[in-house]
A protein has these predicted regions:
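C-terminal catalytic "cap/lid" subdomain
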Residues: 1-237
Length: 237
């Protein structure tokens, strides 16, 4: 069983089928976190902002890329506050939101040692605003935070059940990997996370597991070491 994990939840998950904030979807994510929290382990969370805005998309409509990325960071703060509220009010779990950009009225500034102290006290820490810098994805931010808090693994929770050799939505013959190496993900350009995030995992020996957040018990089972989704690792065979 993993003792400290970083859960990355894509922003699209929070949008459900409607986009924006789908509170049924957010509650489902919170329930999975609450179930995992019963294992008395340390849990950090990073939420994307794609349900509200994607910086890389806004750039195409005439918004300066750096500005668009900051807009995306603020979107992750909105999602983080929504998740915090549901975790505390519905499930009674103590949480802290730490932001990579100063926003003192609603969140703590990210301070590594304080984050670790919160985790040690059994609080769930939600890391908002990405890395605080434009041109970096929330996947990269999640890997960075996982490394900084000495997480055993990063769980990437999405709407798909793992990593495939081809896009399963476009190709019925796509094959799912149970386990795949960082190098293979990079060499084959498998579209599960950006290359910066994967390279950072590889350099720091951080395993990443890709799973479907909407399968009940998936997060808890992954933490328990059960076979869930796809494991991206050094995979020495």
């Amino acid at each position: 069983m993993y003792q400290r994990v970083l859960l990355k939840v894509s922003g699209e998950v929070f949008g459900g089928t409607k986009g924006g904030l789908d509170y049924e979807a957010i509650t489902e994510v919170a329930k999975q976190i609450a179930d995992a929290n019963e294992l008395n382990i340390n849990i950090g969370v990073v939420v994307g902002g794609g349900n509200i805005i994607r910086g890389i998309d806004a750039d195409r409509f005439g918004v300066l890329r750096t500005t668009a990325d900051y807009m995306g960071m603020l979107a992750t703060v909105i999602n983080s506050l929504a998740l915090q509220s549901v975790l505390e009010e519905k499930f009674g779990i103590h949480t802290r939101v730490q932001s990579a950009i100063p926003i003192a009225s609603v969140a703590e500034n990210f301070i590594r040692r304080r984050a670790i102290r919160h985790l040690e006290k059994g609080r769930i820490v939600i890391f908002a605003a990405g890395t605080g810098n434009p041109y970096f994805s929330t996947d990269t931010a999640a890997v960075l935070r996982a490394i900084e808090i000495n997480a055993d693994i990063m769980l990437k929770a999405t709407k798909v059940d793992g990593v495939y050799d081809k896009d399963p939505k476009k190709n019925s013959e796509a094959v799912k990997y149970d386990e795949v190496s960082y190098r293979e993900v990079l060499d084959k350009q498998l579209k599960i996370a950006d290359s910066t995030a994967i390279a950072l995992c590889m350099e720091n020996h951080l395993p990443m597991m890709v799973l479907d957040i909407f399968v009940p018990g998936n997060v808890k089972n992954a933490i328990l070491g059960k076979k869930v989704g796809t494991l991206i690792c050094e995979c020495k065979k």
